[in-house]
Structure formats: structure tokens, C-alpha cells
């Protein structure tokens, strides 16, 4: 809606190589509302095996387009092509796995000491999920959030890192090719309050899944408190490299 764009740089030479849309607050709001509309539609009502078909189709698209996706992620991040290409094939298995899990979600029957009363639990989709992805592993860390969310019948707004967003916009085109209902998966990128804060304070966002640093995580926790959104945070790990 804002029609603003920005250039993303190739870290090999620090030269611009792609132009991507910059989401305004209105764009972010529009993406969340599209996800909410999709959640109120057919998507969560589909049989799990029907949702599984879309997840498997996403996996197939990843395998068929691994070279293209790997090349884009390499140019955008500087990671080795042999790594990004293999990773695109590898993460297809995430979508396959959660496709298989979609129809295996069970509730429980709880013992209760009152006659003629039965207590049961059931699992239902939570709603709109905001998935916030860091620059250094866009495709992989999207898979860890998107695949389980879709399998359970949720809709998703993916906030791509503004440092290396190009590959997720291409991935979104592949997802669209599967025929998944409009609004189920949305991809945005942008800066500061207009994108990140608007997304994490939005009253229609029920869950926030974030991978990144502790400073941003603290802001997300504060923002999520406004609507009591559920939050899951992955804030890095100890991965020493001996040279």
C-alpha cells in the first residue's frame, strides 16, 4: 500500500542487487488482517490430511527450486552456495514431517471424581501467528515456525529480516503456486516501529515466534503484553568455531 521499496546489498561487494517492498504500518496491518480473514475462512476447518497436502506441496516446491533459492540466499547473506542449496532440500523434510503430524494431534480424557461428568481436552489452532526471522538463515528458520503453524491450522505473517529478505519473497511465490488459500501465508519486511512494533502489538496476533537477539526479544515481550499474545523466543546458542 505504501509502495515504498529499499535496496538489499550483496555482502560480497556491498553493492545493491535487489529491490524489495518496505512495509509501512498500514501494510503490516493489512497483512495481519489478511491472515485473520483466512483464519476465519476455510483453512482451519480443512481436514488435517487436506492441510497436509499443501505442506507436502511446499516441500516439493523447495526440492524443485533448491538451486534458485540457494543462489538467492547466498547472494543476500554471503553464505556458501553448497550450504544454502542443500539446506533448501533439507528443510523440505520439515514440511513433510509436519504434514505427517497434522492428523496425529490428540486430546485427552481426564479422570474426575464426579458422577455423570466427563472432562476432555482438545487442541485447536490459536489464530494468527507472527513469525519473525533473522537475516542469517531465512529459509531454515522460517520452516521451523511456518510448518508447524500451518499443520495445526493457523495462519502466518512472516516478518523477514530487512538485511536479507529477498529469498522469502521468492519462497512466497512458490507457496502461492501450491494453491494454498489466500491470506494463509503472508510475507512482509520493513524497519522499526512501522513493521516490527505494529506486528507485535497487533490485537489480532495471537502468537509471536521470534529468533534473534535479546534486545529485540525484550521489546517483543513488552509489546506482546499489550494483548497477552503468546511468545516463543529463540535467542541464539553457544556454537563455538575452532580455527
Residue ranges and their predicted role:
Residues 14, 51, 73, 95, ...:
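Residue-level signal for inorganic ion chemistry
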Residues 15-105:
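Glycine-rich loop-to-alpha-helix module at the N-terminal edge of alpha/beta enzyme cores
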Residues 1-20, 53, 57, 89, ...:
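Terminal low-complexity tails and localization/encapsulation signals of metabolic enzymes
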Residues 108-182, 228:
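Conserved small-residue-rich beta-alpha loop and adjacent elements
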Residues 95, 168-171, 199, 220:
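Hydrophobic packing residues within well-ordered alpha-helices of enzyme cores
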Residues 21, 132, 157-161, 188-189, ...:
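Active-site-adjacent beta-strand anchor residues
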Residues 128, 177-243:
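Conserved NAD(P)+-binding/catalytic subdomain of aldehyde/semialdehyde dehydrogenases
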Residues 26, 64, 68, 79, ...:
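Short alpha-helical
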Amino acid at each position: 500500500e505504501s509502495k515504498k521499496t529499499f535496496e538489499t546489498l550483496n555482502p560480497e561487494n556491498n553493492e545493491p542487487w535487489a529491490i524489495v517492498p518496505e512495509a509501512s504500518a498500514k501494510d503490516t496491518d493489512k497483512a495481519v488482517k489478511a491472515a485473520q480473514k483466512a483464519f476465519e475462512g476455510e483453512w482451519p476447518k480443512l481436514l488435517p490430511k487436506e492441510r497436509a497436502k499443501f505442506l507436502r506441496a511446499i516441500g516439493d516446491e523447495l526440492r524443485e527450486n533448491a538451486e534458485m533459492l540457494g543462489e538467492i540466499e547466498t547472494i543476500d547473506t554471503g553464505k556458501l552456495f553448497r550450504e544454502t542449496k542443500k539446506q533448501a532440500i533439507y528443510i523440505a523434510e520439515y514440511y513433510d514431517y509436519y504434514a505427517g503430524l497434522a492428523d496425529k494431534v490428540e486430546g485427552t480424557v481426564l479422570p474426575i471424581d464426579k458422577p455423570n461428568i466427563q472432562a476432555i481436552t482438545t487442541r485447536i489452532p490459536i489464530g494468527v501467528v507472527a513469525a519473525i526471522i533473522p537475516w542469517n538463515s531465512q529459509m531454515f528458520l522460517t520452516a521451523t515456525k511456518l510448518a508447524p503453524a500451518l499443520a495445526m491450522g493457523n495462519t502466518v505473517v512472516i516478518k523477514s529480516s530487512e538485511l536479507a529478505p529477498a529469498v522469502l519473497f521468492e519462497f512466497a511465490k512458490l507457496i502461492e503456486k501450491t494453491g494454498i488459500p489466500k491470506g494463509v501465508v503472508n510475507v512482509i519486511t520493513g524497519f522499526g516501529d512501522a513493521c516490527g512494533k505494529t506486528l507485535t502489538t497487533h490485537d489480532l496476533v495471537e502468537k509471536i515466534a521470534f529468533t534473534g537477539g535479546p534486545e529485540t526479544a525484550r521489546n517483543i515481550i513488552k509489546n506482546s503484553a499489550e494483548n497477552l499474545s503468546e511468545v516463543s523466543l529463540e535467542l541464539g546458542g553457544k556454537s563455538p568455531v575452532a580455527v
